[in-house]
């Protein structure tokens, strides 16, 4: 299969939405759509009284509205800082480039975001917002956990559209050749992925980290009522994401220029294994804590 010739810049008819070096790209649009849909879904969760057993929800819809800005900043700042620290600083070529042009750190429009950095940025945003609003930060994390896969799904789809983060070479019939006119134009006539079929690992991640993780977390929220069990949804997110990411690292192409880690580990594995470990501990603790009994009458949040 040949990778479809999709321009990473969004077009309306024949017009590209571009102003000099700045352009509206599918990757940026994926962030916007993911955040907006996640915001509305979080408000829906807060307003669904059945999920809270008659107790007051963790946050109000107005607080969710305010939290969106904090989370957006956490995603952008954390994602970029994480990419610089976890990848650029360990890549000899990129590290040398940063030494010559340190302000390249701020060129987010040229690409380079880390999920794990964005995850830590969102965690920081939740902690700071929870302290300001005097909300239990772990319960606030439980509210955000079922929402996160929405953004992950759109982000991985955008990775696919960009023709980046492709997988290892494969002989499977769904293997894809990540080479087309757009990619050649952006890489001085070459195709970084070569001309052999590769795993479309971006789509694997969209399916597991996006669709399947969304279904698991929302089953836990709606059927198991785990929004009432402090820390359980955060734990489920950490465990599932850690498992999915570690398993998919086997088909993702290794990051170019990164050092060789022991035991065949990749940076994605190194950053995901602690998530898995913390998630197991959190779930063990959450399942031991008693759940407040449901109230006689459901509380309908404003």
Curated annotation (Swiss-Prot):
Q: In which pathway does it act?
A: Protein modification; lipoprotein biosynthesis (diacylglyceryl transfer)
Recorded topology in the membrane: Multi-pass membrane protein
From which residue to which does any coiled coil extend? none
Q: Which residues bind a 1,2-diacyl-sn-glycero-3-phospho-(1'-sn-glycerol)?
A: 156
PROSITE patterns in alphabetical order: LGT
Q: Which terms does the record give in the GO molecular function aspect?
A: phosphatidylglycerol-prolipoprotein diacylglyceryl transferase activity
Compartments, as annotated in UniProt = Cell inner membrane
For this protein, the parts annotated as crossing the membrane are 26-46, 67-87, 108-128, 231-251, 263-283
> Its GO CC terms?
plasma membrane
| Gene Ontology annotations of biological process type | lipoprotein biosynthetic process
Q: What is its EC number?
A: 2.5.1.145
Under InterPro entries, the record lists: Lgt
Q: Which UniProt keywords apply?
A: Cell inner membrane, Cell membrane, Membrane, Transferase, Transmembrane, Transmembrane helix
Recorded hits in PANTHER family, A to Z, give: PHOSPHATIDYLGLYCEROL--PROLIPOPROTEIN DIACYLGLYCERYL TRANSFERASE (PTHR30589:SF0), PROLIPOPROTEIN DIACYLGLYCERYL TRANSFERASE (PTHR30589)
Q: Which family does it belong to?
A: Belongs to the Lgt family.
Q: What does this protein do?
A: Catalyzes the transfer of the diacylglyceryl group from phosphatidylglycerol to the sulfhydryl group of the N-terminal cysteine of a prolipoprotein, the first step in the formation of mature lipoproteins.
The name of this protein is: Phosphatidylglycerol--prolipoprotein diacylglyceryl transferase
- This chain's source organism reads Caulobacter sp. (strain K31)
Name the gene that codes for it. lgt
